[in-house]
Curated annotation (Swiss-Prot):
UniProt name for this protein: 6,7-dimethyl-8-ribityllumazine synthase
Active site: 88 (proton donor)
Gene label: ribH
Annotated binding of (2S)-2-hydroxy-3-oxobutyl phosphate, by residue: 85-86, 127
Pathway: Cofactor biosynthesis; riboflavin biosynthesis; riboflavin from 2-hydroxy-3-oxobutyl phosphate and 5-amino-6-(D-ribitylamino)uracil: step 1/2
Pfam family, one: DMRL_synthase
Phylogenetic classification of the source organism: Bacteria, Bacillati, Bacillota, Clostridia, Eubacteriales
Cross-referenced InterPro entries: LS, LS/RS, LS/RS_sf
UniProt entry tagged with the keyword Transferase: yes
EC number: 2.5.1.78
GO biological process, one term: riboflavin biosynthetic process
Length: 154
């Protein structure tokens, strides 16, 4: 039996990160977590490129643009969609997750879903580096592992 696993080293990887400006007090912490993870695992700052978009709904189109370039080993998508009193949360979170998954499958580039979808602001804050770790850091770990796994399977 042959088992394949991606290494957890970011040396030589080029990573694009897309960050939603909406709820920036949360998303900036997710971005910091992603960058911290990439650098701790050997990525050079020059190999990390960040695109800010207005909101989470705009993430998939920029993910597609970045994944299409053939320049990135992975694209990390970061945002924070927090439930409110209207169904807007359901529409946005559903379409963003579908869009990100579609890009990854279509372009065969790891496009990592690091968009928080929470019921409360408190839950988002917890997942951005307080109680529940930093989901931006976790997204970067997934990007590293998946990038290296894709290289093995090529």
């Amino acid at each position: 039996m042959k088992i394949y696993e991606g290494k957890l080293t970011a040396e030589g990887l080029k990573v694009g990160i897309i960050v939603s400006r909406f709820n920036e007090f949360i998303t900036s912490k997710l971005l910091a977590g992603s960058i911290d993870c990439l650098k701790r695992h050997g990525a050079k700052e020059d190999n990390i490129e960040v695109c800010w978009v207005p909101g989470a709904f705009e993430i998939p189109v920029i993910a597609k643009k970045m994944a299409s370039k053939g320049k990135y080993d992975a694209v990390i998508c970061l945002g924070a969609v927090i439930r409110g009193a209207t169904p807007h949360f359901d529409y946005v979170s559903s379409e963003v997750s579908k869009g990100v998954a579609h890009v990854s499958l279509d372009k065969e580039v790891p496009v990592i879903f690091g968009v928080l979808t929470t019921n409360t602001i408190e839950q988002a804050i917890e997942r951005a580096g307080t109680k529940a770790g930093n989901k931006g850091y976790d997204a970067a770990m997934s990007a590293i592992e998946m990038s290296n796994l894709m290289k093995i399977l090529d």
